[in-house]
Each structure stands twice: as C-alpha cells, then as structure tokens.
C-alpha cells in the first residue's frame, strides 16, 4: 500500500517526536553530570575548578618536555639544511675541504710520478716502436729506467716553468755528449716542445700523456749514440713530468688557447669561450673578407649610381634612334638597373636585363656588367686586387686568380679604355616585330630570353600597325607578320640596321667601341640568324597562303554552281570585300587558311585582304587589325575613327571591330592610299561612321535611316531568290576584282573595286549583321521565322562556307577587322531600336531569322561585324568581355539559333568567342589549327 507524500511526511514527524521524547526522558540530570565531573557543580565551591586547571597545565608541560626530548640536535638540522651552520662552524668544513683537496693533489702527483715512463711502455709493448729503437732500449734498460726517475725528480724544481730548449740549456748533462750528438738531440727536443701543448689538454690525460711523451722518446733515441740515450730519455721524461706537475694552475688558459675549430663545445661553454677564438687569425681573415665584400658592394653601388645618369642620357639618344613613338626606355631601364644594382659580391653571373627595348643579352657577367666600364689607369700594377677585380667584373671577365693574372686580363682593355666591351657570352637577340606599344610585353624574362610571341614575327612595322596593336602583346597579335609583308621596308624610321646597332649598343653606350669588331661581328651574326629565322617563317607562311589560295580558287570553281547565301550572308560577304583593304595581310593569308574549305566569296575576300594590306605600305598597313586581347580599341585602328561612338567602343580581346560606316563614308575611306596612319586606316576600313550621314547602317545599299523609307526597306527584306541573284553577280564581280588584285599585287589606289562591291551589297536587314541590333522581343512568329531561317540555313549550308570564308577572313583572329563594314553602331543604334520596334511583327521576326542564319557560322568572329557603341541600349555586346570569358556563343549556331538569340544581351558578348572552331558546320578547323600553332 503506497503512502501519499503528505502521509509519509506525517509518519516521519511522528517518529521523530517519539525519539525526542525518549531521549529527553532518558537524559541525565545536572546533578548526575556534576557528580561525574562533566559539568561544574551548580552551586559547588571553587576547589573543583582549581585542580582542573592544574591538571591542564601539567598536561601541557609534559607534552612540551616530551617534544624537547625528541627534537633533533643542531648537527642533524644542519645536515638536513633546516639550520644554517654558524660562521664558526663553517670554517671547520672549509678547512677540511682544503685538506681533502691537498690530499687528492698529493695522491695525483704521486701517481703521476710513479706512472710508467715511455721506455716502460715501449718495453711492455703498450706503445708501438721501431725494432731498432726497441733494441737500443733493451741494451740500456736498467740504467735508463733508474736514472730517468732520479733525474726527473731532481730537475723538476729547477725546470718547472722552462720550455724544452731552456731545460736543455740548463741541463748539466747537456755538455757531456759531443756537439753533433747535442745537435742531434735538439731536433727531437723541438718536437717535444711542439707536442707538449697537445698533451696539456687535461690534467687527467694519463693515457694521452705517455703517448705524447713516447714520441719524443722515440725521436730522441733514434739518432742518438749509445752513451747519450740515458740523458735524452731523462730529459724528455723530466720535461713531461714538469709540464704535468704544473698543469693544474694553468688549466683554464691553455684549454682556451688550444681550442680547435672542429672540437665540440657544449652550449653552456660557448657563450664564454666564443670571444677568444674570434681573436684567431682565421676569424680576422673572415672579418677582412667581410669588410672587403662590403667595400666592393659599396663601390659597385656608387659606380652604378654615377653611371645611371650617363646611361639614361645614352638611352634617350638610343630612344631617338629607335624612333618608337611613346616608348620610354627609361621605364624599361630602371627596373633593369635595379636588378643589376643588386650587389653581387661573388662572381655568379646575373643575366643582363635588356636596357634597350630591342636588345636582350644573355650574358655570363655579374650584375655590374651592365655598367659602362670606366677608363683604366695607365699603371694596372698600382691598382689593388679589389680594384682589379672590380674592373674585371664590370667587363664580365673572370675575377679569380692572382694579381698578375688579373692584370694580364685587363691589359687588352687599356688600349680601348672607356669603351664598353661586349661580353663574350652575350647573344643579343633583336626581335624586329616589336611595336612601340608591344614592347612592355617584351621585357625580358629573368632568363634573358625573348619569348617570340608569334612565329610569324616580322620586320619592324609601321607606326600605324603599331598603333593597331597598341596595348597588345606580340604573342597575341599576328599583326606585323603577314605573308604578304615579306620583309618589305616599313615606314618605321629605324631600319633594321639601325635597330641592330642600337640593340648592340643596348644600355651600354650611345655607340659601340670601334675596337673588338669580332665581338660585334658575333652579335651581328647572331642577329642575322634571327632575321633569317624570321624570314624563313614568313616564307613558310607565304607558302601556306599560296596553298590556301589555290584551294580557295578550286573551291570557288566548285562553289560557283552552288546557290549563294541568303541575303544576309551575301551582304556580309560583300561587306567583307569592301572592308578588306583594312584587313591585315596576315589576316588575309590566315583568313584564307581558315576559309580554305569555304566557297569562292571567302577566297575573294581573303585574297583581297593581303593585297590591300600590301598596297598600303604606309601606315595603312593596319595589318594588325586583329586586335590582341590586350589591345584597346583606342590604339586599334578603330581608335582613329572620326565618330565618337566608334571611339567609345570598349576593347574586346579578339573582337575585330567593324564599325559600320555609311556607304558614302565607306567609299571615301576605302581608298587604301590615304596616308593618315590610324585615322586613315579606320577610314580605309570604312569604319568611319560619319555623323552627317546619319544613323545609317553602313550597308552601301539604302542604309537604315530614321526615315520611314529606310524602315520600309528594312521591314521588307529582299526575297531569297533576289539575294541569290545578287550573290551570284557579287561573287562574279569579286572574282574579277580579286583577279585584278592578284595580277597587280596591290589594291588599286582609287579602290574602285571596293566601292563597286560596296554599292552592290544588298541592304542588310538591320539585325542581319549585328546580333546587337535584334530587338529583345522574340515571339511565336519569331520562332517560326527562326525555323524558316534554319531551312534557309539548310539551303545556305553549302554557301555558308563561302559566307564563313568572308566572315572568317574578316573576323578571324588574324586580324581582319574591317572586312565587314557592317552596322554603323553608335548614334545609329537607338534609332535602329526604334526602327525595329516600328516593324510589323512578321518583318522583325524575318530579321531575326535571317540574322540567326549568320551568327551561327559567324559566331565568334561575328563580333567584328558589330562593335556596338557604348550608348546603344539594345547592343549589350560589351567588348570589354574577353571572348574567352563568354563561352555562350555556341548558342548562336544555326541549330539552336532561335533560343540563342532570344538572350541577346547575354549572348551578345559571347558572339566574339573564337570557340567557333568547335562548330562542325565551319570547315575552319584545319586552317585555324595552323593559326593556333603559329600563335
């Protein structure tokens, strides 16, 4: 039966009470307690308390006495370190300690005195000796051992502090032997003197001492005649004993003096004993070396600082020779000098950093070698070794050897004092294709080798082309070396010879020394090798271009029967031709390489391009229209465009900027002969978008204008058959034009063919060429149109190769920037957006579908077609995005063209990707592989 909590507590309380009651009943009364003595009686007398107190005091006394008896005496406390011994008591153990030490010392001395001498050790075969010595010892055994001990202890007092020589002079027995005998003993005694320091290492070195003394014993006994051995042996033993006797007080100092560098010193002793060894000759020598090196470093730095200004002046002169606009060599020079200025006391070579933009010397000299060597004094013998070494170091010669060797090395330089001597190890590689703005990319790597960016590097390029590749590094721009170029002279004032000379001069001086022509000849030979390599590469490229041209011509003949591209493609193709004068020669050759599989229009444009470039030997050789990713449009030919919208184009690495120019502007600009460098090039490319012409797309046919007529033209694109017809006529005309160009090898100065091509270009619906122009409003009808576009693409699949040829020639990374004078974007684009908005839905979708046909094949290179102005709202193609970053352009390939185009803004930048190589429809893979290999 379980109890509730309250009931349980009640039970406990009751039990507790009952227990309390029992205890109260059973407890003793006070009387009982008082009787038992537990409490004082209630009314009792004081006698009860007194005895109790006495008892307590007696107890404490007893306990104290007990403790006093048991406590330990003082001696035990002192031994237990509980108490300190008093001064009186402390003197006793100290005296005892002294006595004990004295006793130990006496014992030691006795043991040392009684220890076996060298002769005994020899007799007992403890020490190895020659047989002759043993025989001599056996002959004089008894007398020797006894006399030795006697002499040792008699002479000890007089010979305590004496060296062996002094002991020998004092020894009364010294005169007994004949003079030759005495002389013969002297050498062994000298050896004793030499050996004694080694024997002093420890007072307890009983084992080592006999050994050290036995050697003198041997050496003494060997040469002596029989009467003398006793005397010499006694002397050696007495000397050893005297040393050992008095070794104890001298202990600390000899140990320090005998410190050997290979001995191990425990860390607790190092701090105390490290200073004494530093006084040794070796330490002083180290300090001298350090000071000498510091002096060398300081003198080198001073020399470099003094010569810096001279070098800067010289390099400014060289800079004028190079005539590279906007290239400040001092920027290159300063970091190089800082590298060279790093003090390099040892003769390890630092690779010379090039002090002139074109020169890179692979030199085996030390860091100071880049300095201009000063004049040598007439008397080389007067120079110190350090100065001689410094002069040798400046001249890149070996620094090791005696002073005479150093002087001999410097003698040849006395004749041509003050003239820098080219280093024997220098291989100066002159890379001609350095454009003023590409030079930064050429600053030599620490190894001192140039990385030739492109195998197709070419002779010095014209300033215009250098402008094109403004910020681009040569590795990315194929600009300068196009097969068309060959090695023809370029407008750059610095001819190859001058650049060679200036590169030879490097940073050393404005002019090379007249002496040591052999050095120059070596350098020139090296440079000639480089030039030969470059020319060989160019010839190879030319051969490839010729092969590609042949293939293209064959394809032209085969493709002439095929249907021309849809109107969109055809217009772009013709535009490529028109813009071709602006395309680089390289681009032409390489573009053809890309388009080798493509139909005739492409080949035509490809051939046009090289010739156009060649014809413009002037700054028009904007061969570097292919802007490397580092190129900024400002330096690019586009930068020269008159229209601000074009100038504002953000740079995209591989985008070839095709700014659409109005047809009139194109006609004006296509004249390749225009001498202006960058602007002329831009005009050549038809990139000039004249604001006067209005926001017209640069299609020579009726351009997009804000007027309603232009809108109606755009909304009603030509039918497919018309486009095909126009394509046929255009291809024929392009063939004729290319024939003329091939025969003449140049573009005609008036570039009538270009104008004719431009005029014949049919109107491109605004969106056809520029993905940017597409209004972002795809509808179901748009999808239908896109499907129709895909059908057209099937028709156009064969011809698309032609179209791609043209586009790739113009857009290939080889640099055909201006091949398509497509859409003049900029101020025109906002009106174009409004125009697109004004289109009926069907027309706009037609535009989309037609447009989608192009972007697929054109994909990445299409970027060149429409460089959008920053202002354009619809054109989100930011050139700032590198094509490698935006990999979405594959969405624009024909099969998926419709969805790809719905994302205009996102896919826009991606259009510029060079990844089009992945597109199977484009037969570009083999030619592009060539270009990528050359890259």
Curated annotation (Swiss-Prot):
Composition bias, Low complexity: 342-357, 695-709
Annotated motif MEF2C-binding, positions: 12-27
Tissue specificity field: Expressed in smooth muscle cell-containing tissues. Expressed in the heart. Expressed in the aorta and bladder. Weakly expression in the lung, testis and kidney. Weakly expressed in the stomach. Weakly expressed in the intestine and colon.
Ranges annotated as biased composition (Basic residues): 244-261
Biased composition (Basic and acidic residues): 46-73
Post-translational modifications reported in the UniProt record: Ubiquitinated; by STUB1/CHIP at the C-terminus, leading to its degradation by the proteasome. Phosphorylation by GSK3B is required for STUB1/CHIP-mediated ubiquitination. Phosphorylation negatively regulates transcriptional activity. Phosphorylated; by GSK3B.
Biased composition (Polar residues): 172-182, 206-216, 358-369, 585-597, 660-691
Assembly mode: Homodimer. Interacts with MLLT7/FOXO4. Interacts with SRF, its association does not depend on specific DNA sequences for ternary complex formation. Interacts (via C-terminal) with EP300 (via CREB-binding domain). Interacts with HDAC4 and HDAC5. Interacts with MEF2C. Interacts (via C-terminus) with STUB1/CHIP. Interacts with PURB.
Name recorded for this polypeptide: Myocardin
Organism: Mus musculus (Mouse)
Lineage: Eukaryota, Metazoa, Chordata, Craniata, Vertebrata
């Amino acid at each position: 039966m379980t109890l509730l909590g309250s009931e349980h507590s009640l039970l406990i309380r009751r039990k507790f009470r009952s227990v309390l009651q029992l205890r109260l009943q059973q407890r003793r009364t006070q009387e009982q307690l008082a009787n038992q003595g537990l409490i004082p009686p209630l009314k009792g007398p004081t006698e009860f308390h007194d005895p109790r107190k006495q008892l307590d005091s007696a107890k404490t006394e007893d306990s104290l006495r007990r403790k006093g008896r048991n406590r330990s005496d003082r001696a035990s406390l002192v031994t237990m370190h509980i108490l300190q011994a008093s001064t009186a008591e402390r003197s006793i153990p100290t005296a005892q300690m002294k006595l004990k030490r004295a006793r130990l010392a006496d014992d030691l001395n006795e043991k040392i005195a009684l220890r076996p001498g060298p002769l005994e050790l020899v007799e007992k075969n403890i020490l190895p000796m020659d047989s002759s010595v043993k025989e001599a010892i056996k002959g004089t055994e008894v007398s020797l051992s006894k006399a030795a001990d006697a002499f040792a202890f008699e002479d000890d007092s007089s010979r305590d502090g004496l060296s062996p020589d002094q002991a020998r002079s004092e020894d009364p027995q010294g005169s007994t032997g004949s003079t030759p005998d005495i002389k013969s003993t002297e050498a062994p005694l000298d050896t004793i003197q030499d050996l004694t320091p080694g024997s002093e290492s420890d007072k307890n070195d009983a084992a080592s001492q006999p050994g050290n003394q036995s050697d003198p014993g041997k050496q003494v006994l060997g040469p002596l005649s029989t009467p003398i051995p006793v005397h010499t042996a006694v002397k050696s033993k007495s000397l050893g004993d005297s040393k050992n006797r008095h070794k104890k007080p001298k202990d600390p100092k000899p140990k320090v003096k005998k410190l050997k560098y290979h001995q191990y010193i425990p860390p607790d002793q190092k701090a105390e004993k490290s200073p004494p060894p530093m006084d040794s000759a070796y330490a002083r020598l180290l300090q001298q070396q350090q000071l000498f090196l510091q002096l060398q470093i300081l003198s080198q730095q001073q020399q470099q600082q003094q010569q810096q200004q001279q070098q800067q002046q010289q390099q400014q002169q060289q800079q004028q020779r190079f005539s590279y606009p906007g290239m400040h060599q001092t920027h290159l020079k300063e970091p190089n000098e800082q590298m060279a200025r790093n003090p390099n006391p040892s003769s390890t070579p630092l690779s010379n950093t090039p002090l002139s933009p074109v020169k890179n010397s692979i030199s085996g000299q030390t860091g100071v070698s880049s300095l201009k060597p000063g004049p040598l004094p007439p008397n080389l013998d007067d120079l110190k070794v350090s100065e001689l070494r410094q002069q040798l170091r400046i001249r890149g010669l070996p620094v090791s050897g005696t002073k005479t060797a150093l002087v001999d090395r410097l003698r040849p330089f006395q004749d041509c004092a003050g003239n820098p001597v080219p280093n024997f190890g220098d291989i100066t590689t002159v890379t001609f294709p350095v454009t003023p703005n590409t030079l930064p990319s050429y600053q030599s790597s620490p190894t001192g080798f140039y990385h030739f960016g492109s195998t197709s590097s070419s002779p010095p390029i014209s300033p215009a082309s250098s402008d094109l590749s403004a910020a681009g590094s040569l590795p990315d721009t194929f600009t300068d070396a196009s097969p068309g170029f060959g090695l023809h002279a370029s407008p750059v004032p610095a001819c190859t010879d001058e650049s060679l000379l200036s590169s030879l001069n490097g940073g050393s001086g404005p002019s090379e020394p007249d002496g040591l022509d052999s050095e120059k000849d070596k350098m020139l030979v090296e440079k000639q090798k480089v030039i030969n390599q470059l020319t060989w590469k160019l010839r190879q490229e030319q051969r490839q271009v010729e092969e590609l041209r042949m293939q293209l011509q064959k394809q032209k003949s085969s493709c002439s029967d095929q249907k021309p591209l849809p109107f969109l493609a055809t217009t772009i193709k013709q535009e490529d031709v028109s813009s071709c004068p602006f395309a680089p020669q390289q681009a032409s050759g390489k573009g053809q390489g890309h388009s080798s599989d493509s139909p005739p229009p492409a080949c035509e444009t490809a051939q046009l391009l090289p010739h156009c470039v060649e014809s413009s030997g002037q700054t028009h050789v904007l061969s570097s229209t292919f802007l490397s990713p580092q190129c900024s449009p400002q330096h690019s030919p586009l930068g020269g465009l008159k229209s601000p919208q074009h100038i504002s184009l953000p740079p995209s690495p591989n985008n070839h900027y095709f700014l659409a120019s109005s047809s009139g502007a194109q006609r004006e600009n296509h004249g390749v002969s225009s001498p202006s460098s960058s602007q002329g090039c831009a005009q050549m490319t038809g990139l000039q978008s004249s604001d006067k012409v209005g926001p017209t797309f640069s299609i020579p046919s009726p351009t997009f204008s804000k007027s309603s007529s232009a809108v109606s033209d755009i909304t009603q694109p030509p039918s497919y058959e018309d486009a095909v017809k126009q394509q046929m006529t255009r291809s024929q005309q392009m063939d004729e034009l290319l024939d003329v160009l091939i025969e003449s090898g140049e573009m005609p100065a008036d570039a009538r063919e270009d104008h004719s091509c431009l005029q014949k270009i049919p109107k491109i619906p605004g969106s056809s060429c520029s993905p940017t122009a597409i209004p972002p409003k795809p509808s179901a009808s748009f999808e239908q149109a896109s499907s129709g576009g895909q059908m057209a693409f099937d028709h156009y699949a064969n011809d698309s190769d032609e179209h791609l040829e043209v586009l790739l020639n113009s857009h290939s990374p080889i640099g055909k920037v201006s091949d398509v004078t497509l859409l003049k974007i900029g101020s025109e684009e906002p009106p174009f957006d409004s125009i697109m908005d004004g289109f009926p839905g069907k027309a706009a979708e037609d535009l989309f579908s037609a447009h989608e046909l192009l972007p697929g094949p054109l994909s990445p290179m299409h970027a060149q077609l429409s460089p959008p102005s920053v202002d354009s709202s619809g054109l989100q193609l930011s050139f700032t995005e590198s094509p490698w970053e935006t990999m979405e352009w594959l969405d624009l390939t024909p099969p998926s063209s419709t969805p790809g185009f719905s994302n205009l803004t996102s896919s826009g930048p991606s259009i510029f990707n060079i990844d089009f190589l992945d597109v199977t429809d484009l037969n570009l893979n083999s030619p592009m592989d060539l270009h990528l290999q050359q890259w």
